[in-house]
Design a protein with these regions (language model features):
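Short, Lys/Arg-rich cytosolic juxtamembrane segment immediately N-terminal
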Residues: 8-19, 53
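N-terminal leader/transit sequences and adjacent low-complexity N-terminal tails
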Residues: 1-7
Length: 121
């Protein structure tokens, strides 16, 4: 039987990057922004904080747009699907960061909106 790779390696940077992505679920853009502002330029944690911030900002816009469109069309019940998509991509970003993978969120790729430089500068 092959050895299992841990979902979250023991490194502090990866663990903190994971928590930074997950902080977006509780603090929206503010948790990732605080982490980004308080870390060294070029560090893994700063890069992941920028990615988390950018995604949460875009997702906030998607929530507002979806609420307006679904409200006009009388499809407010579909907001639950938008929320599930947001939660899934937030968790995916956290897992990828925890595994040390340089992953770009599909929503960020699609919109190309990056107010914070994802290279960590």
């Amino acid at each position: 039987q092959a050895a299992r790779m841990p979902v979250f390696p023991a490194g502090d940077s990866e663990r903190n990057a994971t928590l930074t992505h997950l902080s977006g679920a509780l603090t929206w853009i503010f948790g990732p922004l605080i982490v980004h502002s308080s870390t060294r330029p070029g560090s893994l944690l700063r890069r992941e904080a920028a990615k988390a911030f950018n995604y949460q900002l875009i997702a906030g816009g998607v929530f507002v747009a979806a609420a307006i469109v679904f409200g006009i069309l009388g499809l407010g019940n579909l907001m639950g699907l938008v929320w599930l998509g947001w939660l899934g991509l937030t968790i995916a970003g956290a897992v990828k960061a925890g595994n040390g993978q340089d992953w770009t969120n599909p929503l960020t790729k699609f919109t190309k909106v990056t107010p914070l430089d994802p290279s960590g500068r």
